[in-house]
Amino acid sequence: MRPNHPVAALSPFAIDEAVRRALAEDLGRAGDITSTATIPAATRAHARFVARQPGILAGLGCARSAFALLDDTVTFTTPLEDGAEIAAGQTVAEVAGAARTILAAERTALNFLGHLSGIATRTRRFGDAIAHTRARLTCTRKTTPGLRGLEKYAVRCGGGSNHRFGLDDAVLIKDNHIAVAGGVSAALSRARAGVGHMVRIEIEVDTLEQLAEVLAVGGAEVVLLDNMDAPTLTRAVDMVAGRLVTEASGGVSLDTIAALAESGVDYISVGALTHSVTTLDIGLDIVVAPPKAERA
């Protein structure tokens, strides 16, 4: 099942912060010395962002910011919005202004646009594979350091939903917590006593025996069914019988996700949405350049 809510907006402050870091990394101490050396300062250019392959678009705000942060007179225009389906050969945006600025910001803009569109595209593929079921697709915290907010936004652009943004969003008792705490019962009872009533508690289990203990002890609202095959997952969902929200996770691929979703599980979390993404191929093509270089 695909969520039908609109894509939640991404803060422009979050966009600018990430793009500033990327520009600083790329421009270094002296800026784009190649463009400065070869292109007169007064030269203007017009370029198009063109998709080289089909996919789902994400990251327009980052691409726009890459130019605006260097020169607010550069214009960035697009008829599209993040989440749009794009075809190979389609123009997704255009930029016009100082040629030096366009070339200096080009790679930063393309890096964000390609990376985030790659996440959105992969998310859509996983979502399409389970669209015939009630299961909802969600991401994980397996994100690129410093880019979590952007990457989780791209997941939403692709039709997925977000799991925890950080460790302070909810309690998620994993296998290592259980091992250190002394077992499922001890971990659950301490968690329930240690957080307020408004905090949701999820616990990870990897066997049906652990699941039975969770159901007997109580205290959790969500159970994460880790690395279970489809038949075992179906038995687990039957055991829960609607008493807890169920989430399947662990080694989920495009080849396996449909069978897992058909078990009746509520959510399927997929780390591969963000941790091993292939960039969507988008290029920037200069379409208008002066026939003769102007003097600075």
From Swiss-Prot:
Entries under SUPFAM superfamilies matching the protein: Nicotinate/Quinolinate PRTase C-terminal domain-like (SSF51690), Nicotinate/Quinolinate PRTase N-terminal domain-like (SSF54675)
Binding-site residues, substrate: R107, T140, R141, K142, R164, K174, E204, D226, S249, G250, G251, V270, G271, A272
UniProt-listed Pfam families: QRPTase_C, QRPTase_N
Superkingdom to which the source organism belongs: Bacteria
Catalytic activities: nicotinate beta-D-ribonucleotide + CO2 + diphosphate = quinolinate + 5-phospho-alpha-D-ribose 1-diphosphate + 2 H(+)
Gene Ontology biological-process entries: NAD biosynthetic process; quinolinate catabolic process
Classification via InterPro entries: Aldolase_TIM, NadC, NadC/ModD, Nicotinate_pribotase-like_C, Quinolinate_PRibosylTase_N_sf, Quinolinate_PRibosylTrfase_C, Quinolinate_PRibosylTrfase_N
Protein's pathway: Cofactor biosynthesis; NAD(+) biosynthesis; nicotinate D-ribonucleotide from quinolinate: step 1/1
Annotated transmembrane regions: none
Gene3D superfamilies: Aldolase class I, Quinolinate phosphoribosyl transferase, N-terminal domain
Coiled-coil residue windows: none
Signal peptide positions on this chain: none
GO terms for MF: nicotinate-nucleotide diphosphorylase (carboxylating) activity
Keywords for the protein's UniProt record, in alphabetical order: Glycosyltransferase, Pyridine nucleotide biosynthesis, Transferase
EC number: 2.4.2.19
Keyword Ribosomal protein: no
A single Gene Ontology CC term: cytoplasm
Function of the protein: Involved in the catabolism of quinolinic acid (QA).
Family statement: Belongs to the NadC/ModD family.
Stored NCBIfam families: nadC (TIGR00078)
Subunit structure, interactors included: Hexamer formed by 3 homodimers.
PANTHER family: NICOTINATE-NUCLEOTIDE PYROPHOSPHORYLASE [CARBOXYLATING]
Protein name stated in the entry: Probable nicotinate-nucleotide pyrophosphorylase [carboxylating]
Species this chain originates from: Rhodospirillum rubrum
Annotated gene: nadC
